[in-house]
């Protein structure tokens, strides 16, 4: 009995120490916003109370191109594209709900329909009736869903490693299972976030190493991944309210 009590006490002590070591508080919104806004950053409030961060850059007289980022990313993903395309095109980017400087929204709706409403609200706010719509990964899924819902508004689609229909996704997963283990593994963060128990405690943990692994995996371990890039993902994830 004494051994059991000692074991339990030791386990509790280890868990407490681990919790203290792994705990990371949130960063104030004002601090993160000041660092990651630019002179072209704008905010507007949707009817549901969501405060949306977006940018309207490039040639204002050129064709409008709306670009939608992927999961766990932000509009900063498109900054290199703005530099390349901005001379000839008007480039609109935005942070979707639960992402970037938009963060949490009052109605707690973050699914596909909420994403479509956000895109539509941004272009409506800017008075844009027709545009080219593009996105990568999750943003690609937003792109083709929005095009199906509003074909009269979209002049062309740009799909970059887009998420697809469920049956296509299942086929891709089957193909992935045939690849080498180190190539097929999903980023640790995405795997863990599928588990309810982890989601419940994730908001209290320091996400740095998970973020670093996830970014490297998402970028296929490209030399483009710098500490500055990792820090951006990390600090945006720690923005107050983003982990709720």
Regions found by a protein language model. Give the residues of each.
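Short, hydrophobic alpha-helix immediately C-terminal to the catalytic nucleophile
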Residues: 79, 120, 144-148
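Alpha/beta-hydrolase fold catalytic core
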Residues: 1-63, 88-89, 129
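Catalytic domains that recognize anionic headgroups
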Residues: 37-40, 45-47, 51, 74, ...
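Active-site loop/oxyanion-hole signature of alpha/beta-hydrolase fold enzymes
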Residues: 45-49, 55-57, 96-138, 142
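Conserved HGGG/HGGXW glycine-rich cap/lid loop of the alpha/beta-hydrolase fold
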Residues: 50, 56-101
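Conserved catalytic-core motifs of eukaryotic protein kinase domains, centered on the activation segment
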Residues: 77-79, 102-108, 168-170
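Conserved hydrolase catalytic core segment
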Residues: 84, 88, 125-175
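Flexible "cap/lid" subdomain of the alpha/beta-hydrolase fold that forms the substrate-access gate
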Residues: 153, 158-244
